[in-house]
Regions:
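C-terminal catalytic core of tyrosine-transesterase DNA break-rejoin enzymes
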Residues: 214-217, 221, 325-351
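Active-site/catalytic core of tyrosine-dependent DNA strand-transfer enzymes
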Residues: 193, 252, 267-318
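Catalytic-site neighborhood detector that most strongly recognizes the C-terminal catalytic loop/helix
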Residues: 252, 295-296, 348-381
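Basic, Lys/Arg- and aromatic-enriched nucleic-acid-binding interface segment
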Residues: 133-151, 166, 173-226, 230, ...
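Non-catalytic DNA-binding core/recognition domains of DNA-processing enzymes
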Residues: 68-87, 94-159, 174
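Conserved tyrosine-mediated DNA breakage-rejoining catalytic core shared by Y-recombinases
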Residues: 231-275
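N-terminal helical hairpins
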Residues: 1-54, 58-67, 73, 121-123
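Short, polar N-cap/turn motifs at the start of nucleic acid-interacting alpha helices
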Residues: 237-240, 318-319, 339-361, 382-389
Length: 389
């Protein structure tokens, strides 16, 4: 099939293009359109040799451009990948095999925790940094952090392999030691929940910002991630088949999701409705529910996370119990109350491990989801009065 097109960048008629392929935007250099094919065969391409750091930057740029990474996450990944390069030293990443990957994993167990915050470690890199931290008897990163580091490297090398920069992914399915109990995030106990919801501000009904009142309650009764709640718009509070709930999505400005499975509908627990959540939503003058929370490094949860960390310290909650602990408690409580695991997965935005469930089934009806949500115990919030507008 042949077509003739006219270029917008010159007056010369363009010769027919083979296979009927015409670029969507004709504002190209005429020479491109005069060729027989818009594509360049692989054998005709010249591979530019990039340094390891250039490949890291390209990997991060692609992630940000495709909205897979926020600027904040990209910077965290940059720091980790540069830490890896400081240890590897060689510029040719093709030289890294499985044995070297295993060696790097062992070195990670000796990696100092927050080296930038310890002035005694400033100026040290690579092996010298590890040795200096050992001399000082400094803390090392947790096994959970090691696992995340290895997962990042596996993603990076998978990306390199898909683009022909390396021949193998030496970090693929590389096992790490199981996390120690003190490395894990903990669930919130009944006594923890009682402490949180009997804070003085809940008793006095004196809140500096609306999110001081609503975020702990929403975390408790939705199982959502902190940023998913901080980024909510009024238009995200919807009614489906007579059931009020929260639409967690990334449709509006500044919203982001962890992954595709995160998009979901979470019904409102009766404890939220009875305390005036719908009236609060209606009263918001801002399109966002918590307009007082600014976007910081791609996340609306920045200030709220710091606020809850201060609250945790004031309450004397154990290390490892943070805003994300509500999510762990949500999952465990519904599981203990006999709610089917695939219903729980749908409520929290986790993918199903079952091919049958993930491929052939549709979402649960709202009335089934709200029935599960309302199994959550609300005795801890019994003394909390409705929100005063």
């Amino acid at each position: 099939m042949f077509i003739t097109v006219q270029s917008e960048t010159c007056n010369t008629p363009v010769l027919p293009i083979k296979n009927g392929f015409v670029p969507a935007n004709l504002n190209h250099n005429c020479n491109l359109l005069l060729r027989d094919s818009y594509f360049t065969p692989k054998s005709a391409k010249t591979q530019k040799i990039r340094t390891a750091r250039e490949l890291v930057e390209e990997f991060l740029e692609v992630g940000v451009a495709q909205r897979q990474l926020s600027p904040k996450t990209a910077q965290q990944y940059r720091n980790q990948l540069y830490t890896f390069l400081d240890l590897w030293l060689l510029d040719d990443l093709k030289e890294l095999d499985r044995e070297n990957a295993e060696l790097f994993r062992e070195l990670l167990y000796q990696m100092p925790k927050n080296p930038n915050k310890d002035k005694r470690l400033h100026g040290y890199k690579g092996i010298a940094l590890l040795n200096r931290n050992e001399e000082l008897g400094g803390d090392v990163i947790s096994r959970r952090t090691v696992k995340k580091f290895i997962n990042l490297l596996s993603t990076f090398f998978g990306w390199l392999k898909s683009r022909g920069h390396v021949d193998e992914n030496p970090f693929y399915k590389l096992k790490v030691r199981k996390a120690l109990s003190n490395d894990r995030r903990y669930q919130l106990s009944n006594s923890d929940l009682t402490l949180i919801f009997t804070m003085r501000d809940y008793q006095s009904r004196n809140f500096l910002h609306p999110y001081y009142y609503w975020l702990p309650l929403l975390l408790r009764f939705t199982g959502a991630r902190l940023n998913e709640l901080c980024q909510l718009y009024k238009s995200d509070i919807i009614i489906v088949n007579g059931v009020w709930g929260i639409r967690i999505c990334a449709k509006s400005n500044g919203q982001r999701l962890k992954n595709d499975n995160s998009m979901r509908f979470v019904p409102l627990h009766h404890a939220l409705i009875s305390r005036g959540f719908l009236k609060f939503v209606e009263s918001c003058s801002n399109e966002r529910l918590f307009g007082e929370l600014p976007l910081v490094n791609g996340y609306y949860s920045h200030n709220a996370s710091k606020w809850f960390a201060r609250r945790r310290k004031t309450l004397g909650l154990d290390k490892g119990k943070d805003a994300h602990s509500f999510r762990h408690s949500f999952v465990d409580e519904l599981k203990q109350k006999g709610v089917a695991i695939d219903i729980i997965q749908e409520l929290v935005g986790h993918s199903s491990n079952s091919t049958t469930t993930s491929v052939y089934s549709r979402s649960y009806k709202p009335e089934i989801l709200v029935s599960a949500i309302n199994k959550l115990d609300d005795s801890h919030v019994a003394a909390i009065k409705p929100y005063a507008m």
